[in-house]
């Protein structure tokens, strides 16, 4: 039962790290990356559809993204969704593809994005700690109910702490890399 609790906590922590990676990828760094547009929803035939399901992305150079829709009739809808998105894109439509040129980030904007990244990183760490707290409560309950011995409970708690530390360190590593990427001119 202790192993199951630890496995479940590990899976949840892995998901929290994945969410943090996606959050970090959606923050603009002044460099063209398709991950910027992962959260853009296009009104496609009346239903909100993720952009990556409607088009392919290409990055011909560091400041340009080419978006080629699978269905040319969706070109205008995609362009509208990109213009309305919080990414701040200025798409240009040539009838076949949408070209987005990523402008250079100002120093103030970079610092603002670093604050956002730190906040998202802290949110991820808090969610990992909450997962740890719930798993520890489960372990304590198992020991209290006599389903596991105190030694097993203590061992499980040590493993849980190591698991938590590894995941928090992973978030810190992602955070440092994203900060360096943002501050790189």
Curated annotation (Swiss-Prot):
InterPro entries given in the database record: Ribosome_recyc_fac (IPR002661), Ribosome_recyc_fac_dom (IPR023584), RRF_sf (IPR036191)
Keyword NAD among UniProt keywords: no
GO biological process: translational termination
Location(s), subcellular: Cytoplasm
Pfam families: RRF
Gene Ontology MF term list: ribosomal large subunit binding
GO cellular component terms, A-Z: cytoplasm
Keywords, in A-Z order: Cytoplasm, Protein biosynthesis
HAMAP family per record: RRF
Protein function: Responsible for the release of ribosomes from messenger RNA at the termination of protein biosynthesis. May increase the efficiency of translation by recycling ribosomes from one round of translation to another.
PANTHER family: MITOCHONDRIAL RIBOSOME RECYCLING FACTOR PSEUDO 1, RIBOSOME RECYCLING FACTOR
Family statement: Belongs to the RRF family.
Designated name of the protein: Ribosome-recycling factor
Organism whose genome encodes this protein: Arthrobacter sp. (strain FB24)
Gene behind the chain: frr
């Amino acid at each position: 039962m202790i192993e199951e609790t630890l496995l479940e906590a590990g899976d949840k922590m892995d998901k929290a790290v994945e969410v943090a990676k996606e959050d970090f990828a959606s923050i603009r760094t002044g460099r063209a990356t398709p991950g910027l547009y992962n959260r853009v929803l296009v009104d496609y035939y009346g239903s909100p559809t993720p952009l990556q399901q409607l088009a392919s992305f290409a990055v011909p150079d560091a400041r340009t993204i080419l978006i080629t829709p699978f269905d040319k009739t969706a070109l205008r809808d995609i362009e509208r969704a990109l213009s309305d998105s919080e990414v701040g894109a200025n798409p240009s439509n040539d009838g076949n593809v949408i070209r987005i040129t990523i402008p250079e980030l100002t120093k103030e904007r970079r610092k603002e994005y670093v604050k956002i990244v730190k906040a998202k990183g802290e949110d991820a760490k808090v969610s990992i700690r909450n997962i740890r707290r719930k798993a520890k409560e489960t372990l304590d309950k198992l020991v209290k109910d006599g389903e596991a011995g105190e030694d097993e409970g203590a061992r499980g708690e040590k493993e849980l702490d190591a698991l938590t530390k590894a995941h928090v360190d992973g978030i810190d590593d992602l955070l440092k890399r994203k900060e360096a990427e943002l501050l790189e001119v």
